Regions:
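A common structural junction motif
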Residues: 27, 78-84
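Conserved short beta-strand edge segments in small beta-sheet-based binding/regulatory domains
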Residues: 36-38, 83-98
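Short S/T/G/P-rich N-terminal loop/turn motif that feeds into the first structured element of a domain
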Residues: 1-75, 97-101
């Protein structure tokens, strides 16, 4: 069953370039695991109509053919070599898993 991952990403101030380096590695590896980046949004202040949480730096919407494909992506050896970039740049994130209704 196709799954969708929405991620709200909050980065450490001043670490934008480090985050971009991690994304340059992580995003292409999605394809290896039957996934697809559907949206990558860096919202501006005017993008929000209403908010009751901290505004994220980026929002990603990704689809994978299955839960197993997502798990395989998370354990990708090449991606794991660069997790230190993620740790250096991302303060926190919120991951939401769902399916198409």
């Amino acid at each position: 069953m196709m799954i969708f991952i929405t991620q709200l990403i909050y980065i450490i101030e001043g670490k934008e370039k480090v985050f971009d380096r991690f994304e340059a590695i992580a995003i292409p590896s999605i394809l290896k695991y039957h996934g697809r980046l559907l949206l990558r949004v860096r919202p501006t202040e005017n993008s929000f109509i209403e908010t009751n949480i901290e505004k994220p730096y980026e929002i990603h919407l990704i689809e994978f053919n299955s839960e197993q494909d997502f798990e395989n992506f998370k354990h990708d050896e090449e991606r794991k070599k660069f997790l230190y970039l993620k740790d250096q740049s991302i303060r926190t994130s919120i991951l939401i898993k769902g399916t198409k209704l």
